[in-house]
Amino acid sequence: MQLKIMPKKKHLSAGGVPLILFLCQMISALDVPLDLVQPPTITQQSPKDYIIDPRENIVIQCEAKGKPPPSFSWTRNGTHFDIDKDPLVTMKPGSGTLVINIMSEGKAETYEGVYQCTARNERGAAVSNNIVVRPSRSPLWTKERLEPIVLQNGQSLVLPCRPPIGLPPAIIFWMDNSFQRLPQSERVSQGLNGDLYFSNVLPEDTREDYICYARFNHTQTIQQKQPISLKVISVDELNDTIAANLSDTEFYGAKSSKERPPTFLTPEGNESHKEELRGNVLSLECIAEGLPTPIIYWIKEDGMLPANRTFYRNFKKTLQITHVSEADSGNYQCIAKNALGAVHHTISVTVKAAPYWIVAPQNLVLSPGENGTLICRANGNPKPRISWLTNGVPIEIALDDPSRKIDGDTIIFSNVQESSSAVYQCNASNKYGYLLANAFVNVLAEPPRILTSANTLYQVIANRPALLDCAFFGSPMPTIEWFKGTKGSALHEDIYVLHDNGTLEIPVAQKDSTGTYTCVARNKLGMAKNEVHLEIKDPTRIIKQPEYAVVQRGSKVSFECRVKHDHTLIPTIMWLKDNGELPNDERFSTDKDHLVVSDVKDDDGGTYTCTANTTLDSASASAVLRVVAPTPTPAPIYDVPNPPFDLELTNQLDKSVQLTWTPGDDNNSPITKFIIEYEDAMHDAGLWRHQAEVSGTQTTAQLKLSPYVNYSFRVMAENSIGRSMPSEASEQYLTKAAEPDQNPMAVEGLGTEPDNLVITWKPLNGFQSNGPGLQYKVSWRQKDGDDEWTSVVVANVSKYIVSGTPTFVPYLIKVQALNDVGFAPEPAAVMGHSGEDLPMVAPGNVRVSVVNSTLAEVHWDPVPPKSVRGHLQGYRIYYWKTQSSSKRNRRHIEKKILTFQGTKTHGMLPGLQPYSHYALNVRVVNGKGEGPASTDRGFHTPEGVPSAPSSLKIVNPTLDSLTLEWDPPSHPNGILTEYILQYQPINSTHELGPLVDLKIPANKTRWTLKNLNFSTRYKFYFYAQTSVGPGSQITEEAITTVDEAGIPPPDVGAGKGKEEWRKEIVNGSRSFFGLKGLMPGTAYKVRVGAEGDSGFVSSEDVFETGPAMASRQVDIATQGWFIGLMCAVALLILILLIVCFIRRNKGGKYPVKEKEDAHADPEIQPMKEDDGTFGEYSDAEDHKPLKKGSRTPSDRTVKKEDSDDSLVDYGEGVNGQFNEDGSFIGQYSGKKEKEPAEGNESSEAPSPVNAMNSFV
């Protein structure tokens, strides 16, 4: 039994109150449980017009349900049908269905008639429709003799079919004797009556087997008419003989074969009438003849043809309108037209109507004492008559029921009792038919029960509707309540819809919709509940779509279709070609998500679709394969897509809108995706933000919107080349205002003064405001107190100052957004603090432990937390040197500060000065500043090693002594006990000699070293020492002089320079670098730095260049041996001049050759003039060159080697020869200038280096 639910009220509130549906007494599409007492209900019956196959048994159905089970009876032709008296008739057990056995004996025609079934129990009786039983008939065609038909080319023709009348009417079609359908066209077609019409005949119409067939579906038989022969001839073939032999009947020559305007073959005349019943298919037909073949047009004179229900059949010769109604009545005109004219025919259509329901009566379940109504409302043309029956008996003669009142098409029940239960029949009839409906009234008292299976699991794809069933029953009618979870969480009206039958609908199911839902049914007799479970699954999506492909014939192509799906659902991928199965060809192969087509052929071109199916959903994507010839083609020009256009907004809702667009040209590269941007003209005009992205195959997008935003949208397309220009903006769409859906972020509470609390937050922007009048509700209260919240509503600002607060007290703070529509959700409280003040108490019990001469450890006791009056940031130590134990360093030094974070109560003081007095104090620090200082605590550092002496200079160098001068260390770090001097010689190969140690009293600042080697370089190491040990050293180098006559070098010392640093960049792979252009006798500080990934590191050292050395050559111009030599040379020159003068005066020649050969001197070679006599008077005895200042050997012979060495030793080298005038080419010590033309010898003093080397 099905009951109708009519909602009276829906109730909804938050905070865990369930969604409640109040229902009255009518329940729709709901069965009364079969274990409850109920009147009969007809569940199955044969059709009203029941045509049977006479060769099979007759089965007349009648099934019903009820409690107790009903009994069945039949009437035939209005009288009781006693099945017990007819051995061929039986009734199925537990059923009212009749079976008439006519296959063994009997005839179907015997059982023709009108049958009606009645199902009855103690609560009432239900009746079936009147079932008209008729056997089907398929009579044979009457035998007839059909003469051949001969027509002139171009004449019209109608081949009659006229099948025998059968039941039901036969289906007509024309075929040849090979059972092939005859071709039809605008010229040749079959009419609705089965005749075959030729608008004009052609020679190709000639054939002898025009056969009309009639198919009778019920008997599955086909009847055949005798074949008709047709011959079409031309005018030339008509001669007198043929014409004489043909009768008028045989020769259809009434109409000329010349061209002619149309005339109608059917229907006849200019007007006709057609009547059709409402809901049927209206078929109008116009077939015309003419030459050329006419074309048919249809119009409705008083209106438009209904576009969705109008169809043209039979080459527009038949107009069909489906599901006709009274509104389709009117005049329809068909127009036949060819080149020679047109003809019209008007068909007047009247639509009548058999009865149809406006409100059919529904079963009614009432509890004792309740009221109810049965309504039976029908319409038709003509208007149907309504009559009531009760339990199959006209209500006028039925037993009277005081709870019942009839009012036309309505029966009103009041204060019903159990005896009021009955089955009522409503009959609506007119001349075109009738409607009969059964509806029971069942009076029950029954507590609620849930009919849906317990713990039913529903699985739904995300973002799709979810329908949770709660079929129920009870009397009185229960109220339905839905809870989420077993304890009942709130159901929001914009998320849930409760249907009349108790079904809960979630229009857009989300992941958070997953869970258990409880349905509760209640009435005054009790309650029942049921739990169902909902699982939300991820949708199946194709994340890699097959792509458009252009391949050459004979090549291979692959399509990929990658699917993303819910992990609990297993998809199956199916490939289709042009929406059909793939060809059964081994060239097509599929593997998981790939389709491969090998040896591509022309027929392989088309649309390939991959479909991923799961048990809950599916997804599809398509790509086009284009097959081209394997000849080279010009390369296409690829570019970014053209912008989309024709943007349109549809389905405009408060929080969503559908955007549709038309893609631009893809410029030979398929579009892979569309990017949608929006502009908020109200809050951020001119600023476009990202909204969504969709695949390149979509042209619509469902966009989620925010309240109170004036949206404009634009779309960009993207392919493998790049992104298109934006489309033109869409029309603007202003969404409705709503309360804010979020609160400000970054809420903080920090005081700036000891008596205030500054509450700050990041304001919402205009897009987040969701409506006009954005404000903030600021609330605060002390965290540890019982105070109520204090609140204030402020304008759209970002801070609020609370004054008069205690110092540094924790507060709970909330900032809630609101606008003219309402409040945002309740925000969570955050903790802040009122303003800080300076700490009140100094750390106590300060202790100092000296670790070594440069390090001390300080300990102190922490201050009480309340005295900090703020966030404890740490402790700060101030320390300073009050005085140094050394007399040299008793000067004021500024205080130094060390801060120790957090709650530490000790710390180390590094970098102290040894042998010094220090003082310190400790202070606590918070966000406001420092507290008072502790009592100063003094301490003393022990002695340490001293620093290097401040300077070191080498003064007054002599042949065997050097004097050192220095300044004491700048930081003695204790009492100096002595100085330590170490030195060692350095030879010409820079090797160091033995090291000599020397201790010097601490009160000295000058010291002379004696008994040193002359002209020797020494390296000195000098440092001071205390009782702790030696300090850093300072180094220096110096050279003793050659002799006392030398010019004393300048003082050499190591001190501080004033020059700026010079920088040289050196390749990182080198390990040395030469410094040039340094000053002699100067100390330099060298710093070498390296920079890499870990940072910059450096080291430095001090070195000193050597002193400028005085020349080790003695001034020979003042030496006695040199003066004597010069006198001898001058005398020799004078003698030579005298000899030359005498010889010239005498003009004689002297034999001096032998003498020259005997005493050949390589230094004095004969240099003859033209007469060959010059040089014969050169006497070796007169030339006495010196060898290192010694006398000539006793044998008075001068060797070449000695002479050469002598001259070279004096700096003249190979140029130390005589000129023609007897003078030296080279000069000693440069005392005499040379002539300009005399060689390249320099007139300057000899090199000090060469002079020094001559003495080594």
Swiss-Prot record:
Record-level GO BP terms: angiogenesis; axon guidance; cell-cell adhesion; central nervous system development; clustering of voltage-gated sodium channels; neuronal action potential propagation; protein localization; regulation of neuron projection development
Localisation per UniProt entry: Cell membrane; Cell projection, Axon; Secreted
Entry protein name: Neuronal cell adhesion molecule
Sorted UniProt keywords: Cell adhesion, Cell membrane, Cell projection, Disulfide bond, Glycoprotein, Immunoglobulin domain, Membrane, Phosphoprotein, Repeat, Secreted, Signal, Transmembrane, Transmembrane helix
Domain Fibronectin type-III: 643-738, 740-837, 842-944, 948-1045
Region forming the signal peptide: 1-29
Topological relation to the membrane, as annotated: Single-pass type I membrane protein
Polar residues composition-biased segments: 1240-1256
